[in-house]
């Protein structure tokens, strides 16, 4: 005989969690904000500013994504209640089992939305940049930086993000000296921001004829791509702008013209580079945009006292500021902040970062 006590408790629990979701995700405020955005988009004044249109449409998309997900969950709960009542009334085991499976699916959807609580920081909804900088360790470190680049590109692809390599400096023998990736997608900065720090690799070096153990370091810095006017003062006399020949893809063109641009902020020694456009003007515009976003993120980190000064992070890519160790010989990867440890090394290097990143977000790092 089919009993309804257990399923009633499950349904009540799901309904409570949905109401909690509505409260801490500001469901009603989000619905009101969508109406406000529609009014703004209908204004002729807005249509003279392309950046504003893009920003408003993206905000509306993110808001509607959450609103629609909550609405669908509520509808699915109502439907499963109807099927449960039918199953109990007719004592139909098949319908009852299908209803239990549907309850499990609804619970998974609720869990996904509950995770959005982690994206509570001001800039979490923006796209982001990933700076990879090779540290101490010579050829091994440059090879390690290339491995990290591949790992992040794989993870971003699994999450449905769009990626673009903005700049890349090829290593002397193998790997890369540095690289900048742009990641676009829903809450890209929120997902990636806790990866900022030093990543340490320990392995038997393939570049050492004696196959001795080597330790290599690579620095990762994540900052948001803020598509609006940033309230940060940059004195242009503090900038040094260099142009050079691009070293990446682009055929013969990149060898004939100095289209790549490097901008250095002299007071902090922070550098941004771009070489993925054929136009020097576009590369300069992109590099300046990165510089503004980068300086803004550093300013925010200093205010919040979440990280040490960026100058220390950039100048001492060795033992300090480590967040994760990758010990290949022992098949162990350990996050030094969260304690998360995995033994499937190749899986992680192939982009299986969910456990590390999700735990860091849950802990509020």
From Swiss-Prot:
Origin: domain of life: Bacteria
Keyword Iron among UniProt keywords: no
Residues carrying N5-methylglutamine: 252
Cellular compartment(s): Cytoplasm
DNA damage recorded as keyword: no
Gene Ontology annotations for the cellular component aspect, listed alphabetically: cytoplasm
GO molecular function: translation release factor activity, codon specific
Entry PTM: Methylated by PrmC. Methylation increases the termination efficiency of RF2.
Major location (coarse): cytoplasm
One GO term of the biological process aspect: viral translational frameshifting
Alphabetically ordered keywords of this record: Cytoplasm, Methylation, Protein biosynthesis
PROSITE patterns: RF_PROK_I (PS00745)
Miscellaneous field: The gene for this protein contains a UGA in-frame termination codon after Leu-25; a naturally occurring frameshift enables complete translation of RF-2. This provides a mechanism for the protein to regulate its own production.
HAMAP family (UniProt xref): Rel_fac_2 (MF_00094)
Its biological purpose: Peptide chain release factor 2 directs the termination of translation in response to the peptide chain termination codons UGA and UAA.
Family: Belongs to the prokaryotic/mitochondrial release factor family.
Protein name: Peptide chain release factor 2
């Amino acid at each position: 005989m089919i009993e309804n006590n257990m399923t009633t408790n499950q349904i009540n629990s799901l309904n409570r969690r949905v109401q909690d979701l509505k409260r801490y995700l500001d469901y009603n405020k989000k619905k009101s904000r969508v109406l406000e955005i529609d009014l703004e988009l209908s204004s002729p004044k807005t249509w003279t500013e392309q950046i504003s249109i893009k920003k408003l449409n993206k905000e509306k998309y993110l808001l509607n994504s959450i609103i629609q997900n909550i609405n669908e969950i509520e509808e699915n709960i109502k439907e499963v209640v109807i099927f449960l009542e039918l199953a109990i009334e007719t004592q139909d085991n098949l319908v009852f089992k299908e209803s239990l499976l549907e309850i499990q699916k609804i619970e998974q959807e609720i869990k996904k939305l509950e995770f959005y609580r982690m994206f509570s920081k001001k800039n979490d909804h923006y796209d982001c940049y990933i700076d990879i900088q090779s540290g101490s360790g010579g050829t091994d470190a440059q090879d390690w930086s290339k491995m990290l680049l591949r790992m992040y590109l794989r993870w971003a692809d699994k999450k449905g993000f769009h990626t673009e390599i903005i700049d890349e400096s090829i290593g002397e023998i193998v790997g890369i000296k540095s690289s900048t990736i742009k990641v676009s997608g829903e809450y890209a900065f929120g997902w990636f921001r806790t990866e900022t720090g030093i990543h340490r690799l320990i392995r038997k070096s393939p570049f050492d004829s004696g196959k001795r153990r080597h330790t290599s370091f690579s620095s990762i810095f994540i900052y948001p791509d803020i598509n609006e006017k940033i309230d940060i003062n940059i004195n242009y006399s503090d900038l040094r702008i260099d142009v050079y020949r691009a070293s990446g893809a682009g055929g013969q063109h990149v060898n004939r013209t100095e289209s790549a641009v490097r901008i250095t902020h002299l007071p902090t020694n922070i550098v941004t580079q771009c070489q993925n456009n054929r136009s020097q003007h576009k590369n300069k515009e992109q590099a300046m945009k990165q510089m503004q976003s980068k300086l803004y993120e550093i300013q925010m980190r200093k205010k919040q006292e979440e990280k040490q000064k960026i100058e220390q992070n950039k100048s001492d890519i060795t033992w300090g500021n480590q967040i994760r160790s990758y010990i290949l010989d022992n098949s162990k990867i350990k996050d030094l902040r969260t304690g998360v440890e995995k033994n499937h090394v190749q899986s992680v290097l192939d982009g299986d970062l969910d456990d590390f990143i999700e735990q860091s977000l849950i802990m509020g790092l």
